């Protein structure tokens, strides 16, 4: 059966390969586990990640566009997953765990609400597909890791509840000075704050925007996305150990990538295998109940996660990290510097204090949107307007 057309029921009851019996540790987004003594903890950690897959029968994108993303939306779903992990860390903490049929905090439903397949959800498939037009991608066209990262950065401006500083490190270079300036800056756009308040929807007893505040933060939580190419057609073996160490960092958000035209969200590794969540199954779109409750079981992977050999990974990836505080960022920088001391391993990217002279700095802090942009986004978020325009920011 084609993986792209699997149903959720098929997925739940199919045979899944269990973890190998090995003494090697299992690493999941900065957490270390033993397969012999902590198997339940591993599965609980995996099940607590938000799992976004293909969906069908959602409202048409653009009013007349696709009602399913089967066959083209896998990288968009992976982008949602890595960004959702950032929001979970931001609002719930890395140690939060989801349990079936157990009441969850209101902030959990606010996070989930931001990714529902509706055009007025901040990071919905509708928003990503429409905003991707500005990155040169037609609706229904397959994305690469860099494109989805750029789109999510633009959409995050309007999520004033989370107040994230999103930085995409280009040219394999992370500039610490740029990130500190970005994270110490106040909210970038008053129009975005107003738009956020207008687009709130009360679900699960809490507005989707939850307590939006204009109080400046000393450090806006950082989402750092680093698009990389780790080889020409196959991953260079010299990067493998460095890639593994990225999953060991407590700031890890994982990796988006996969195989050509088949994206996955990688959350860890065991031995020489990567552990990932697979978006290639089609589930019905989730609709809010009359009481605005979100049925959430299909957003959690309740079976052993998929695995693939590291050597099978396509070399085009994006690595993600989340630093809630400046101390988290400083700690991350120290860990990255230690990676350069790994014998026989190549660093995947360069960490520098200031922008190298040979790299042009283009609008690192230019996150604000002009008035015409805000007007287009207001139209985009207006649930009464079924014929809104495609955005190009």
Swiss-Prot record:
Modifications after synthesis and translation: Phosphorylation at Ser-383 and Ser-392 promotes autophagy by increasing protein delipidation activity without affecting proteolytic activation of ATG8 proteins. Phosphorylation at Ser-316 by ULK1 inhibits autophagy by decreasing both proteolytic activation and delipidation activities. Phosphorylation at Ser-316 is dephosphorylated by protein phosphatase 2A (PP2A). Phosphorylation at Ser-34 by AKT2 promotes its hydrolase activity, leading to increased proteolytic activation and delipidation of ATG8 family proteins.
Assigned EC number: 3.4.22.-
Catalytic reaction(s) noted: [protein]-C-terminal L-amino acid-glycyl-phosphatidylethanolamide + H2O = [protein]-C-terminal L-amino acid-glycine + a 1,2-diacyl-sn-glycero-3-phosphoethanolamine; [protein]-C-terminal L-amino acid-glycyl-phosphatidylserine + H2O = [protein]-C-terminal L-amino acid-glycine + a 1,2-diacyl-sn-glycero-3-phospho-L-serine
PTM-bearing positions, type N-acetylmethionine: 1
Highest taxon, organism lineage: Eukaryota
UniProt entry keywords in alphabetical sequence: Acetylation, Autophagy, Cytoplasm, Cytoplasmic vesicle, Disulfide bond, Endoplasmic reticulum, Glycoprotein, Hydrolase, Isopeptide bond, Mitochondrion, Phosphoprotein, Protease, Protein transport, S-nitrosylation, Thiol protease, Transport, Ubl conjugation, Ubl conjugation pathway
Family annotation (SUPFAM superfamilies): Cysteine proteinases
Residue positions of motif LIR: 388-391
Activity-regulation annotation: Inhibited by N-ethylmaleimide. Redox-regulated during autophagy since reducing conditions activate ATG4A whereas an oxidizing environment such as the presence of H(2)O(2) inhibits its activity. The cysteine protease activity compounds is inhibited by styrylquinoline compounds 4-28 and LV-320.
Keyword Cytoplasm among record annotations: yes
Modified residues (S-nitrosocysteine): 189, 292, 301
UniProt keyword annotation of Transport present: yes
Subcellular location: Cytoplasm; Cytoplasm, Cytosol; Cytoplasmic vesicle, Autophagosome; Endoplasmic reticulum
Gene Ontology annotations for the cellular component aspect, listed alphabetically: autophagosome membrane; cytoplasm; cytoplasmic vesicle; cytosol; endoplasmic reticulum; mitochondrion
Residue numbers annotated as active site: 74 (nucleophile), 278, 280
Phosphoserine: residues bearing it: 34, 316, 383, 392
Disulfide bonds: 292-361
GO molecular function: cysteine-type endopeptidase activity; cysteine-type peptidase activity; endopeptidase activity; peptidase activity; protein-phosphatidylethanolamide deconjugating activity; scaffold protein binding
One annotated GO biological process: microautophagy
Classification via Pfam families: ATG4_LIR, Peptidase_C54
Family recorded in the similarity comment: Belongs to the peptidase C54 family.
UniProt subunit comment: Interacts with PFKP; promoting phosphorylation of ATG4B at Ser-34. Interacts with GBP7.
Function of the protein: Cysteine protease that plays a key role in autophagy by mediating both proteolytic activation and delipidation of ATG8 family proteins. Required for canonical autophagy (macroautophagy), non-canonical autophagy as well as for mitophagy. The protease activity is required for proteolytic activation of ATG8 family proteins: cleaves the C-terminal amino acid of ATG8 proteins MAP1LC3A, MAP1LC3B, MAP1LC3C, GABARAPL1, GABARAPL2 and GABARAP, to reveal a C-terminal glycine.
Domain remark text: The LIR motif (LC3-interacting region) is required for the interaction with ATG8 family proteins MAP1LC3A, MAP1LC3B, MAP1LC3C and GABARAPL1. Required for proteolytic activation and delipidation of ATG8 proteins.
Name this protein carries in UniProt: Cysteine protease ATG4B
Organism: Rattus norvegicus
């Amino acid at each position: 059966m084609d993986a792209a057309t699997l149903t959720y029921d098929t997925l739940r009851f199919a045979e899944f390969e269990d973890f190998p019996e090995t003494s090697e540790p299992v690493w999941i987004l900065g957490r270390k586990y033993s397969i012999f003594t902590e198997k339940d903890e591993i599965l609980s950690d995996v099940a607590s990640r938000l799992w976004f897959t293909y969906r069908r029968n959602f409202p048409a994108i653009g009013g007349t566009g696709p009602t399913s993303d089967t066959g083209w939306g896998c990288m968009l779903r992976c982008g949602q997953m890595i960004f959702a992990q950032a929001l979970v860390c931001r609002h719930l903490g890395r140690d939060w765990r989801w349990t079936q049929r157990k009441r969850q905090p209101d902030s959990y439903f606010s996070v989930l609400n931001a990714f529902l397949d509706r055009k007025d959800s901040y990071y919905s498939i509708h928003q990503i597909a429409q905003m991707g037009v500005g990155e040169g991608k037609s609706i229904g066209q397959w994305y690469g890791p860099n494109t989805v990262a750029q789109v999510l950065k633009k959409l995050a401006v309007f999520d004033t509840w989370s107040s994230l500083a999103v930085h995409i490190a280009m040219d394999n270079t992370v500039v610490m000075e740029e990130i500190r300036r970005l994270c110490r800056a106040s909210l970038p756009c008053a129009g975005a704050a107003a738009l956020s308040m207008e687009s709130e929807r009360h679900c699960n007893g809490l507005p989707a925007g939850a307590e939006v505040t204009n109080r400046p933060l000393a450090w806006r939580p950082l989402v750092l996305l680093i698009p990389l190419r780790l080889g020409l057609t196959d991953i260079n073996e010299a990067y493998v150990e460095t890639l593994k160490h990225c999953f060991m960092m407590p700031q890890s958000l994982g990796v988006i990538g996969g195989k050509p035209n088949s994206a996955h969200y990688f959350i860890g590794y065991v031995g020489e295998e990567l552990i990932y969540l697979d978006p290639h199954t089609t589930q019905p779109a989730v609709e809010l109940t009359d009481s605005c409750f979100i049925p959430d079981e299909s957003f959690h992977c309740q079976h052993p996660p998929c695995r693939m050999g590291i050597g099978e990974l396509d070399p085009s990836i994006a690595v993600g990290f989340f630093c809630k505080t400046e101390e988290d960022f400083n700690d991350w920088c120290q860990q990255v510097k230690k990676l350069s001391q790994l014998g026989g391993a190549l660093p995947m990217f360069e960490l520098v204090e200031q922008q190298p002279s040979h790299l042009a700095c283009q609008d690192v802090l230019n996150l604000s949107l002009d008035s015409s942009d805000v007007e287009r986004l207001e139209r985009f978020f207006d649930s009464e307007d079924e014929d809104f325009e495609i955005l190009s920011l």
